[in-house]
Amino acid sequence: MVVAQQLGQWAEQTALKLLKEQNYEWVASNYHSRRGEVDLIVKRGNELIFVEVKARGQGNYGQACEMVTLSKQKKIIKTAMRFLQRYPSYQDFYCRFDVICFDFPQKIAKTVQQDFSKFHYDLQWIENAFTLD
């Protein structure tokens, strides 16, 4: 599980770097409510983007983006709504839900501290991945 946590932290840091390169401003990381968690919250102009980040290595079933189930989407939406209640200055922003996924085609050793950036990976950024509907 330690490697999975390291991979998740690396993926969130890398996703945030990518977002900043696209002129998004960091608002929050790992925002928790009793309903769930949002990995990253960023803004650009009057857009507020709630970002779910997923990473998977070979040997895991399915691709990273497939892990953002309908149940997970509902939890993210409820957590986002709680964020907006807690921080009313963002209530007039246009809200969007994105998913950023990292898929590693190779197996990742479970016992070694990894620099995941040295591995080849496929990156998928899905803007408006899901909506409030």
Curated annotation (Swiss-Prot):
Pfam family, one: UPF0102
Ranges that cross the membrane: none
InterPro entries: Restrct_endonuc-II-like (IPR011335), tRNA_endonuc-like_dom_sf (IPR011856), UPF0102_YraN-like (IPR003509)
Any one GO molecular function term: nucleic acid binding
Origin superkingdom: Bacteria
Cited CDD domains: PoNe_Nuclease
Coiled coil location: none
Family to which the UniProt record says this protein belongs: Belongs to the UPF0102 family.
Family matches, as PANTHER family: UPF0102 PROTEIN YRAN
Protein name: UPF0102 protein ABSDF1354
Lineage, highest ranks first: Bacteria, Pseudomonadati, Pseudomonadota, Gammaproteobacteria, Moraxellales
